[in-house]
Amino acid sequence: MAIVKSKPTSPGRRFVVKVVNHDLHKGEPYAPLLDKKSKSGGRNNTGRITTRHVGGGHKQHYRIVDFRRNKDGIPATVERIEYDPNRTAYIALVVYADGERRYIIAPKGLSAGDKIESGNAAAIKVGNTLPVRNIPLGSVIHCVELKPGKGAQLARSAGASAQLVAKDGAYVTLRLRSGEMRKVLSDCRATLGEVSNTEHNLRSLGKAGAKRWLGIRPTVRGVAMNPVDHPHGGGEGRTSGGRHPVSPWGIPTKGYKTRKNKRTDNMIVRRRDKK
């Protein structure tokens, strides 16, 4: 991968920083693994905005990605690495020995022609998927399940990973990139290695229009609104908002804890690090 900066022929070109990977497939995606993806504009079935700052963007097809990796004992060969507009990580098209093709999240270092497999007896090798109880301590893993057989839920985005730090009976302990220490059932599966496109955080979109291509609409400050629209709105001239920062619905923001999931509190050994 390469970090590419453009000549400053315009303000938008001056600030853009691209991450270019010349090993990505340049043709069309594999059609049988595509699905339609309709845009909601952030609205629900009644037409009300339920997610702000969403709308527009380039049309996309959804790539059906295999997060379960449940074809045990059947080796697969990586056919190509592809760009996926629906996620920050790259995806790999793999063809199994029985002829079936699937998309998987591509780990760092995986390339066309590599062999991968999944199952209890899979080798300790980047791209292989096996239960975490069979993975050595200290290993770097990604695409971790939280419930056996449900499919990967943790460490799926570009450059993400977790480290296996302890095993204790039916559970193992993982250290996540946020600093959180979390217990996971030892029957849950994970894939060895870290997720590809590790330089994704170095990119700069360069201009507002690039954000619109991604389907992200502008974020307006509350102090720039009218009182009817936001608790910080109104006032003569510029104001500070007059109170501690809140959302449009009056909920404190900037550090206010919103986690409401007691059911899994006992699985978190240590909360994430404060930034």
Curated annotation (Swiss-Prot):
Part of the 50S ribosomal subunit. Forms a bridge to the 30S subunit in the 70S ribosome. Residues 28-55, 224-258 are annotated as: Disordered. InterPro entries: NA-bd_OB-fold, Rib_uL2_dom2, Ribosomal_uL2, Ribosomal_uL2_bac/org-type, Ribosomal_uL2_C, Ribosomal_uL2_CS, Ribosomal_uL2_dom3, Ribosomal_uL2_RNA-bd_dom. One of its GO terms (cellular component) is large ribosomal subunit. It comes from the Bacteria. One of its GO terms (molecular function) is rRNA binding. Residues 28-38 have a biased composition (Basic and acidic residues). This is Large ribosomal subunit protein uL2. The keyword Flavoprotein does not apply. Keywords: Ribonucleoprotein, Ribosomal protein, RNA-binding, rRNA-binding. It comes from Cellvibrio japonicus (strain Ueda107). Pfam families: Ribosomal_L2, Ribosomal_L2_C. Belongs to the universal ribosomal protein uL2 family. One of the primary rRNA binding proteins. Required for association of the 30S and 50S subunits to form the 70S ribosome, for tRNA binding and peptide bond formation. It has been suggested to have peptidyltransferase activity; this is somewhat controversial. Makes several contacts with the 16S rRNA in the 70S ribosome. One of its GO terms (biological process) is cytoplasmic translation. HAMAP family: Ribosomal_uL2_B.
